[in-house]
Structures are given as C-alpha cells and as structure tokens.
C-alpha cells in the first residue's frame, strides 16, 4: 500500500485530530463523526482506528509501520513505547516538532529536496533516524532559509518538546535526548497498535 495522498479532512473527521497530517480542523457541526461513531465499537475496529491514526499522522506506509513494530518488538522495553520513540526520532517528524515545517508531509518535502543538513551533511531520507546530540540545520543558501523562516516565526515555542531545542536565529535544532511518552504529539493508545 502506498502513502496516502487523498483528502485529508476526511481522515480527520473519521479518526480525530492528526496534527502531523494537516493544520485544518473539521467544522464542529459535522454529522459524519456521529454517523461513524454510532453503534457498538468492536475490538477490531478500535485497534484498526488506532493503527490508522498512527499511520496517517506519521505518513507511513503499511510496510514501514510493520517494520517499525517488528524492530520495537525485539527491544527489551515496552514495545509500544519503543515504537513511539522510533517514530518520533524520524527526521521528518523532528523537523515538524521543531517548527521548521507546518506538517509532516511538508517536512518530508524539505528533506527530499535536500534543504536539510544533519551534523553538517545533507540528508535526503525522511525516515533518517536521529540520535541524541544531532544538530539539524538548513542549507546555507537563501532559498532554504526562506522556506523554514516563515514556519519558525509562526510556531509556538511553548509546544516545543523537552527533548528538542531550537535556535530561531540560526535556523538550527538540536536533539537533546530520546523523548518521553508524555511529550508525544498524538493522543493514541500504542498498545492497541501493537496488538493489531
């Protein structure tokens, strides 16, 4: 299955708020949510919805998500927490959380178009796994800095997670440590995803 490129608001109405997918919010008087939420929720449906939330928020394919679940399953700690840590340490997600892009697909495009440097080297793979003490900067040309400048100016510094720091003047971000569960930007029950 390929990455989802269809209407985003349909997914938000169905699954709830997905800040990584889009900044838009559905109208409050929407009847679609009532229609989908009516009746008894089966266990399979609940698990499927949690998995779909995770997939659409982080912009993953089915195969990528299965690979991350497999890696997290090999870890000695809680599989759900390790899964969220792996997803949160992706380069496209860190750019989104630093405020250098408005959405995760926007951050993915910045990385694919070679505007981002990690530790002084160009990285064009959005799934690049960042480690603590990685320094993320933009290229030293006006076009790259201009793309990031608007997003950094409009981002809220109060929403910045504790495991990241950002220097708004130099367009630079730093990964301090691996994140804690409470700073994940998505309301999700990761155990249901692992059980699915």
From Swiss-Prot:
MF annotations from Gene Ontology: rRNA binding; structural constituent of ribosome
GO biological process: ribosomal small subunit biogenesis; translation
GO cellular component, one term: chloroplast
Domain S4 RNA-binding: 89-157
Keywords linked to the UniProt accession: Chloroplast, Plastid, Ribonucleoprotein, Ribosomal protein, RNA-binding, rRNA-binding
Top-level taxon in the UniProt lineage: Eukaryota
Subcellular location: Plastid, Chloroplast
Physiological role: One of the primary rRNA binding proteins, it binds directly to 16S rRNA where it nucleates assembly of the body of the 30S subunit.
Binding partners and assembly: Part of the 30S ribosomal subunit. Contacts protein S5. The interaction surface between S4 and S5 is involved in control of translational fidelity.
HAMAP family in the record: Ribosomal_uS4_B
Family stated for the protein in its record: Belongs to the universal ribosomal protein uS4 family.
Listed name of the protein: Small ribosomal subunit protein uS4c
Gene: rps4
